[in-house]
Amino acid sequence: MSQNTLVLATGNAGKVAELRHMLSQTHATADWLVRPQSEWDFAEADETGTTFVENAIIKARHACQQTGLPAIADDSGLAVTALNGAPGVYSARYAGGNATDSDNINKLLKALEGVEESQRQASFHCVLVYMQSAEDPTPIICQGRWDGHILTHPVGEEGFGYDPVFWVKEKNCSAAQLSKTEKQALSHRGQALKQLLEQLAK
């Protein structure tokens, strides 16, 4: 890759921090200048897609158009089986356009009131898209999935989003109780980024 400045096409501070950390820990990208799109003065893309893939492409293309630089976009969310896959692509705004993480968690827990533990399966999904330019005809698209189940109350202080209510069976704790390194090794975003870095290294 000739251009070592990379735009992270997201306004989500948690995603920016997580992606920056992961990229800095990887030899192939340790020397990249990773800049969130908030460093430029332009509005976020309208996420009009109905899938994570569509929205990630929309965001990556928009960031490339606005900055003239390569971009990585992340579209991700939580799918809860008992809620027919909700909140899905609406995860970040489940409780409304200006919802906080706590607002979204509270709405989720309310929606799952009375649902037995054995029926609270859920999965985090992440789609990462890399585009060299806005006209890139072959964006790199990588996907990750992380299975778990939803707790009845938040546990842990790390992470962001729905992490405090997402139980990670193999670690016997919530996602919000994992270290950054542990989470990177297991998470949907870590899986997708590993695939993306392998593609970029080719």
Swiss-Prot record:
Name the coenzymes or cofactors required: Mg(2+)
A Pfam family matched by this chain, by name? Ham1p_like
According to the UniProt record, one GO cellular component term is: cytosol
Q: Where is the active site?
A: 75
One GO term of the biological process aspect: nucleotide metabolic process
Q: Which residues bind Mg(2+)?
A: 46, 75
State the EC number(s): 3.6.1.66
Disulfide bond entries: none
Tell me which NCBIfam families the record gives.
RdgB/HAM1 family non-canonical purine NTP pyrophosphatase
> Subunit structure of this entry?
Homodimer.
Question: What does this chain do?
Answer: Pyrophosphatase that catalyzes the hydrolysis of nucleoside triphosphates to their monophosphate derivatives, with a high preference for the non-canonical purine nucleotides XTP (xanthosine triphosphate), dITP (deoxyinosine triphosphate) and ITP. Seems to function as a house-cleaning enzyme that removes non-canonical purine nucleotides from the nucleotide pool, thus preventing their incorporation into DNA/RNA and avoiding chromosomal lesions.
Annotated family: Belongs to the HAM1 NTPase family.
What protein does this entry describe? dITP/XTP pyrophosphatase
Protein species of origin: Idiomarina loihiensis (strain ATCC BAA-735 / DSM 15497 / L2-TR)
Taxonomy of origin reads: Bacteria, Pseudomonadati, Pseudomonadota, Gammaproteobacteria, Alteromonadales
